């Protein structure tokens, strides 16, 4: 995960954005008014993210069990008598965090580098947090090894399922491979298993899902 966290640098960045806007730069942003709003990822990154926020001095008690709330309040505990509500946590999908920050829905956010690169937005990358580490992989069914190459020779393109169309397209283009990208949002592994695509491009932390579905 990357793309935060230092309270001082966040506040400085937000102030700089407001100064730029006052000088005639009308880029989308929230400015320095109201509570600092942080886009927090749900899912596998959540637990480590809460630990990072807490270590940084933020009260995340409401965030640990938000129920159905999408926005919860917090405070900077280092301020001693901080007022509950001086920080807002917006709970989002990791892949959506860059858009929330880039389009003014949050002042800062936490997500994986994969989401940041795929979003391709002009964002200030504050820090790498050192958790949620994954590897990009290209995989196909083991039982159909070599079929992708034969399909490529026959139709002149490789059909690839991925939730990272921008990254995958660039990767194949750099290698001179003509790829037809099939954009999926979940269960990417199904693409080649059911014969819809030749391969997948995805991220993996342990490789367990690949092994369980006989992908190599």
Where are the regions that the model predicts?
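Domain-level signature for soluble enzymes in the chorismate/prephenate branch of the shikimate pathway
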Residues: 26-216
């Amino acid at each position: 995960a990357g793309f935060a966290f230092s309270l001082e640098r966040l506040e400085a960045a937000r102030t700089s954005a407001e100064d730029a806007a006052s000088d005639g730069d009308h880029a989308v942003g929230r400015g320095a008014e109201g509570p600092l709003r942080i886009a927090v990822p749900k899912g596998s990154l959540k637990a480590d993210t809460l630990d990072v926020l807490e270590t940084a001095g933020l009260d995340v008690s409401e965030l640990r069990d938000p129920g159905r709330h999408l926005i919860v309040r917090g405070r900077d505990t280092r301020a001693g008598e901080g007022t509950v509500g001086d920080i807002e946590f917006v709970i989002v999908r990791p892949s959506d965090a860059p858009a929330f920050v880039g389009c003014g829905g949050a002042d800062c956010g936490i997500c994986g580098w994969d989401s940041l690169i795929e979003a391709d937005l002009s964002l200030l990358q504050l820090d790498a947090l050192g958790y949620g580490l994954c590897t990009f992989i290209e995989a196909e069914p083991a039982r159909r090894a070599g079929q992708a190459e034969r399909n490529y020779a026959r139709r002149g393109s490789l059909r690839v399922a991925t939730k990272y169309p921008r990254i995958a397209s660039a990767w194949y283009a750099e290698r001179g491979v003509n790829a037809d990208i099939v954009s999926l949002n979940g269960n990417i592994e199904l693409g080649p298993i059911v014969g819809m695509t030749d391969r997948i491009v995805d991220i993996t932390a342990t490789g367990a899902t690949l092994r369980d579905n006989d992908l190599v």
